[in-house]
Regions:
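Acyl-donor binding region in acyl/amide transferases
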Residues: 1-131
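Intrinsically disordered, low-complexity, positively biased terminal segments
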Residues: 85-185
């Protein structure tokens, strides 16, 4: 994901360059699931820069914790980031149980701060309803970025994403085999 962290690839002003950077990342992960079918999970992190602003960050982190928190705490940051948000205020801001309803509120609140939800946060939330979040820590060895651990169960990836990033790879392998069979490779 570090290849996508670069701000110039996240901007809608970058046009197709930004679209393909993230799309290529997902295609590569889809290929891994085909080449290594015993893989059951993707484990990684979402990165936010300190320049993002603590108010917007805290809104996003609260939303992720409310809807995707790993209650078993199988992984925890050694030194967790302590959000500065007012818990009572955020509970009132996000009163709904439905992710979609609270997501609309999150998007509006973050935009009101002059920011956007980071593209990878959106992308991960749209991969699977069973995504798990493990907490956030500051990486003092990489520009003091804030990294939130996540886990995606491959079997739970939405069919639409599976079709786009896994099945397209399977189809390309089938085509390659057809070309080889007819000596066209």
């Amino acid at each position: 994901g570090r290849s996508f962290v670069r701000v110039e690839y996240q901007s809608s002003q970058a046009g197709a360059k930004s679209i393909y950077a993230l799309d290529n990342l997902w295609d590569g992960l889809g290929a891994l699931t085909v080449k290594h079918p015993t893989i059951k999970y993707f484990f990684g992190k979402v990165t936010m820069y300190p320049s993002f602003g603590s108010k917007g960050r805290d809104l996003i982190l609260y939303f992720l914790k409310k809807h995707f928190w790993n209650k078993e705490k199988i992984i925890t940051p050694i030194v967790p980031l302590k959000p500065k948000y007012n818990l009572t205020l955020l509970e009132r801001l996000f009163p709904n149980k439905a992710i979609k309803d609270n997501y609309k509120i999150l998007n509006q609140a973050v935009r009101a701060l002059g920011q956007n939800i980071p593209p990878l946060v959106n992308a991960y939330m749209n991969l699977s309803s069973t995504m798990q979040v493990f907490g956030t820590a500051i990486n003092d060895e990489f520009g003091y970025v804030e990294e939130t651990g996540i886990l995606i169960k491959i079997a739970d990836i939405y069919q639409e994403k599976r079709d786009r990033h896994i099945e397209t790879y399977v189809d390309s392998l089938k085509n390659d085999l057809q070309f080889e069979r007819f000596g066209l490779s």
